[in-house]
């Protein structure tokens, strides 16, 4: 017995390592077949026996009953293998009717519709004709010239019936050959000489210069090469013989009432057979050509309908006008073979029921209803009853179970003991949606679920249902216990934080328990042990909230117990008692008012220092304590708990006065409508916040004087502050003011809702509010589907990402630094590098001690060293730079977030990444602005303040001093840094062009000092020199217009689009500055003082006046930039991972250089960058209306924006490279999730980016057979280059290309995986022509062919099997 079979399952399934797909040749089809189907009949409706030679013929497909021939001459096993001489049926199992195929010999060749109509059409590409033309030939509309002979016709020219007749008359009957139908296409394909054609195409490709032609040639060449490599013959795309699939797969079922229900395929096959037989007769009886041709066309259409109904022309329909389901439809879509039956199967030994809460369960338990358990564990019970001799036979055992005898229950208890069951709640969005528990038998019919796992399942008890599955084999039970037990899933795989955290009531109970009140009974008493305190509590000398002193023994670093005196309360000591004793876990971590966040941190701490078992026990006890005090605290929620602040009316009156002032300014023409709108919205935002803050202050400190009638602490406030339920946003709406609302298009309505829910809304307010709420409801309904689809696409693209080795040995890595936004550090460096590995040795910058070795995992203790060393950026290894040929290595991935240790081999990190990004997707709003319709627009930023005492450093400082002695920033990329004493960056602020700087380089500033200020609503255009204004190209009514505001009657000059006028096409409105002599002033950079004005700019100066340095010439209102829809939430994530071009995308500079504006072209402006290294200048064409953020003469750096907007990802990759691109995508995706408070580890996003960067585009073929412009997998590309270099040839060159996840999934190396994702027919057609081999490396392909997935335990089985094969080969 070979080693392989030892590992093979004890079944007769074939062992194989790869699957190949090819076009079937006519001989192959005949070799599969067990006989020709010649009659369209199915079953004789009187005898119900299959008709001979029909679609269900027993002679061809096998017997209908096991070991029994059709006429009944031979029956039973003893006759197996005999073929009955009377009816011709082989005596065997009826199962063969699922396997045996038949065939139909076609009377005329027929084109396979997949190769004809699946775009790009393979047949027409090979023949170099258009698809339209090929169709005309195939469907008998036109003749094609096969051999021009003596005529002047071209080979391949199409002729209609009349033209053919004329040509025959002109050149004679036999002068040339023209033909029609599939026969001629087959002949033309047969005549193709591929090696010759390949050479011709190569030569043509090198000569041609047209890009379009090149693309076409590359496509054709690729196809020719595919045929050459796969040894497929092109004429096989035209079929002479048609396979008939086994009858059991297209069954005919009898319904009650003597009618039959049949599979659509039978009907489609019948049409083919009928038309084929008719055609045979017509050919035999030498019918006129026109009739034969019509029949051939009908046969072609019948075969088309069988293969892919509706692909061409009208779909064949049944009597009820419903289109027939063809072979293609069987595979396609959610209901197709792939997704319905191969990737999603229904399973036996399962049940489902409603869930109820089980607070007295332990974390690893669930309550299983007795009825359910009895049914699910039936076979186990039978075997045990028989084993113990309680029942003599299985039948007796069955009867006992049905009667529910008492001994059955005892046996059930025993069977169930330590046999884990799986619980699953749909939708299973991440791997924690299925977990294993030990069942406890309970009365009733509902499953009991432990409260702490609800967060992972996203379950609540308002009628949710859950499914139970029983792992049967010992291996399955083992895996369930080791990998899936709820106690082994404490940390979330998405971010490495505990997911088993107390929530809702438990948090509220613990918060209440740990409150310390002032002036409580017995304050300041001293205690030395808990019993004494309990006594005092029982006799009402203290309460659980009294501040007391307590002597407690604590473990020190040496592991000795030392007594310490602490200020605490009895409540906190109760929590403290539950803490496991460990020197790293001090009492102070819980000696405070515990909020949800604090509790989560404590659990994390316990997990890191005391391990999993201690954590589970701790969490369970914490839960019981929390429930107890949530109950005994008697916290309730009443109308009086919503406090309306007294200052509300004052704030509202002040704001209304402010808004009146804006209205006045608007009527006086000082500000535009857009500016007024922005200011009004801002004022109301500020007002709402003020009211909310006052309300919060009042809620947080309730009046103490009338205690005990009044609660010591506000219940609503407690719920929100503890993190139990509700947010301050919601409290604001209950007791403050609802604030601004959004319209359904996302615009903010200027009049806010002044009332809150306690006071009640007016009719008008109610209408406004309902509008926003409806929008929110609709969004929620729509986003669930798109979120699910995004998850599916992510899983598909990353499913073959598996950890395959320990270390790939690369030296590459990526540099990470903390994320700074608006000057605040949002994500500290520590959070970004925790659980990653160092790419280089890392030393202390001052002492030069080694902190981290290359490849060492950065854990919590190393983090402290890095933080104390004050490092602000670090090189870490990343999956993006991993060089494993298949999969990814452990070192590049780092810590497995679910366990907190280095990731093990065989872990399916791709799927985990996809789930981590997709699971929170449903929480992401479609639009970023709604909380129940309330607008959450912050006030516009118009200044920056120092957030620390620090030293100022200004980058690219370009400042002019204006007439008021103020410093005005003239640089487009000025940044202000705040440095600490060691010179480390603490904050970074972008200072916009035109801002007033209030500090200078090197100044020392104190916290909250203002550093710079600017007008947030307009972008100014500012002069660098003093001089006289001269207007150029400003033609009234064509390029500039006096706009009079209807509301105010005040005119202002505005630049307008001039292209609608013929003479306006060349106009470029600008302002020049003249000196005293009337000549144009020269600026510091050597260019003339010219200021181009974009469309929409409002002039602030008159022609001919004198202005000084730093004056504003014109303002560009910013309303045009704020109203454009900011794509947020889920659509933004989808836009990024699909690598789509954003709407209104930015243009980025490709090189460092100076900007010049060239001559305009039609409706486009020309921006030219002259590189500093003197290479060729680069031109950009941008639409005129867009706001260009650079001015003539500005110096730009590579990657700077020339036009505002989101940059195109492909541009970033081309200009800045992979690392910058990856950082950008990670930053943008994280920004969306951060807004919703969702934490996801960067490495998950990096895994997806790696999958998007799998392909390269060849730029130079070198000495290889690759074609320029061909897209190829980067590992394949490296292999080809290695071969070339071994043979002494020049290697090819290529550049990385970024693909969206859908495209990347469809172009994966595995055709099975791609076909089961989308566009099934296209993928299979391509794969068949290329004769692709699927190595079965990913998860999906293996699930589909029914093997263990090569991840987790399956990975090692796979490894062992491969080792076994090797051993066997060596032994042979």
UniProtKB/Swiss-Prot annotation:
Q: Does the keyword Metal-binding apply?
A: yes
Ranges annotated as spanning the membrane: none
Keyword Transcription listed: yes
Q: Which InterPro entries does the record match to this protein?
A: DNA-dir_RpoC_beta_prime, DNA-dir_RpoC_beta_prime_bact, RNA_pol_asu, RNA_pol_N, RNA_pol_Rpb1_1, RNA_pol_Rpb1_3, RNA_pol_Rpb1_3_sf, RNA_pol_Rpb1_4
Tell me the CDD domains matching this sequence: RNAP_beta'_C, RNAP_beta'_N
Report keywords, A-Z: DNA-directed RNA polymerase, Magnesium, Metal-binding, Nucleotidyltransferase, Transcription, Transferase, Zinc
Give this protein's Gene Ontology molecular function annotations.
DNA binding; DNA-directed RNA polymerase activity; magnesium ion binding; zinc ion binding
Q: Where does Zn(2+) 2 bind?
A: 808, 882, 889, 892
The organism sits in which domain of life? Bacteria
Binding of Zn(2+) 1, residues: 69, 71, 84, 87
Listed under catalytic activity are: RNA(n) + a ribonucleoside 5'-triphosphate = RNA(n+1) + diphosphate
Q: Where does Mg(2+) bind?
A: 460, 462, 464
Looking at the UniProt record for this protein, which Gene Ontology cellular component terms does it annotate, in alphabetical order? DNA-directed RNA polymerase complex
Give the cofactor binding note: Binds 1 Mg(2+) ion per subunit.
| Cross-referenced Pfam families | RNA_pol_Rpb1_1, RNA_pol_Rpb1_2, RNA_pol_Rpb1_3, RNA_pol_Rpb1_4, RNA_pol_Rpb1_5
Instruction: Provide the cofactor list for this protein.
Output: Mg(2+); Zn(2+)
Q: Which GO terms describe its biological process?
A: DNA-templated transcription
- Its EC number(s): 2.7.7.6
**Which SUPFAM superfamilies does this one have?**
beta and beta-prime subunits of DNA dependent RNA-polymerase (SSF64484)
What the entry lists under PANTHER family is as follows: DNA-DIRECTED RNA POLYMERASE, DNA-DIRECTED RNA POLYMERASE SUBUNIT BETA
Subunit comment for this entry?
A: The RNAP catalytic core consists of 2 alpha, 1 beta, 1 beta' and 1 omega subunit. When a sigma factor is associated with the core the holoenzyme is formed, which can initiate transcription.
Relate the protein's function as given in its record.
DNA-dependent RNA polymerase catalyzes the transcription of DNA into RNA using the four ribonucleoside triphosphates as substrates.
Query: According to its UniProt record, which protein family does this protein belong to?
Result: Belongs to the RNA polymerase beta' chain family.
What's the protein here called? DNA-directed RNA polymerase subunit beta'
**Source organism lineage?**
Bacteria, Pseudomonadati, Pseudomonadota, Alphaproteobacteria, Rickettsiales
